[in-house]
Amino acid sequence: MALRILFVEDHTHSRQTVSRLLRHFHYDVVAAPDYRTASALLDKWQFDVLLSDIRLPDGDGWNLVTVAKSKQPLVAIALTGLGTGKDEKPGLSCGFDHYFVKPLDFYRLRAILRGIVSRHSE
């Protein structure tokens, strides 16, 4: 089963690179550059995973995860440049299940995604 991932990242190069890597490992990736686009996609499609930057040009990932989880059950992963320990706690308390500080540790992300696939397969 291929996970459908909504990847929200405003930085074009990062969005393209991470999307390509995820597709290489056979994940179904839909990429959005901002909050508004991501919210519209959440209304249109069902996702297994939300992978979102925290700082977006028209909103923030903290609010997006709250909206996303009110619309559908999914695993939410924060990807952010906010790298202090004090930033992780609010991210997890607002609904993110995992918190990554940039640069992305792709091996750790793949391990988490494999775990999600395993749970979906049971």
Residue ranges and their predicted role:
Residues 53, 80:
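Active-site residues of response regulator receiver
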Residues 62-73:
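Short amphipathic alpha-helix used as the core "switch/output" element in two-component signaling
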Residues 12-30:
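Two-component/phosphorelay signaling modules centered on CheY-like receiver
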Residues 63, 83-99, 111:
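Alpha4 helix (beta4-alpha4-beta5 surface) of REC/receiver domains from two-component response regulators
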Residues 34, 60-63:
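Acidic catalytic/metal-coordinating carboxylates
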Residues 31-49, 89:
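Acidic, metal-coordinating helix/loop segments flanking the phosphotransfer/catalytic sites
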